Amino acid sequence: MSGRRSKRSVRGVGKRSAGELARPPRAALPDWMGDSRVFLPQGYEAGYRYPLLVWLPGANPFDLGRAMSRVSLRNFVAVQAAPPATGADIAEPVWEAIDRACSRLSVHPDRIYLVGQGEGGRDAFRIACRQPRAFAGVVSLGGGFPLDEALFARIADVRRLPMLLCAPRDADEAAATQTDRTLRLFHAAGAQLALRIYPAAETDNVSRAMLADVNRWVMDGVCGAAEPRRAAYAT
């Protein structure tokens, strides 16, 4: 995935070599302990560059540690972006979270994924489509793709960006119509979208099955497995 990122996309990353990103100072690690917005995998190794999951929560309370325990305890470093200030650019907290993780932890700079929940999923789509070279993929858990916002302006780059939309089966008619329009849009544009539909979620429209699929889908991308562009349905 090298070459997909732009130096402008993640501020500061372009100023550091891959070796510097792979070997953060061990003395810095204790600063992260007890930070609820940071998740370190079990058996964290500073010499291995981990995929980074950047979480954008929805309006409801969010527990990063609990979410990651259902995604994977070993595969990823994860950070939670702070809520943007009123009227501020929704992407700014994301860049700040990425900068902080890349400067202090062992993160692979070409394996950064956005994962959003609810409205956070819609924002994840917005941010990733506006800066598609900055990310290896984007996942939305229950947040529909923002239609009619010209998010395919950089279509050549967007076509290379894998996206996953996880939706509840019991969605209302309006949500179902939006999903249908989204599939048509992606098909016409030749962009990559995997759609997976699940039984009713446990809480906040997010189920254990959704979170387990986040792990599988991201690791498929990390390991080079091709994600089919057709819709996929989970039961």
Enumerate the language-model features and the residues they cover.
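The feature captures the conserved acid-bearing segment of alpha/beta-hydrolase catalytic domains
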Residues: G142-V222
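Primarily recognizes the serine-hydrolase "nucleophile elbow" in alpha/beta-hydrolase
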Residues: R111-V158
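Loop/turn elements at helix/coil->beta-strand transitions in domains of secreted/extracellular proteins
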Residues: R49-P51, R74-V77, P109-R111, R133-G137, ...
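Active-site-proximal beta-strand/loop segments in catalytic clefts of secreted hydrolases
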Residues: W55-A59, Q80-P84, V115-E119, S140-G144, ...
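Gly/Ser-rich "nucleophile elbow"/oxyanion-hole loop immediately N-terminal to the catalytic nucleophile
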Residues: Q42-Y48, A88-E119
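Active-site machinery of serine-nucleophile hydrolases
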Residues: Y50-C102
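A domain-start/cap signature at the N-terminus of enzymes
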Residues: M1-P51, R126, D180-A188, Q192-A194, ...
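Short, surface-exposed alpha-helical segments at coil->helix boundaries
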Residues: G65, A91-W95, F125, A176-L183
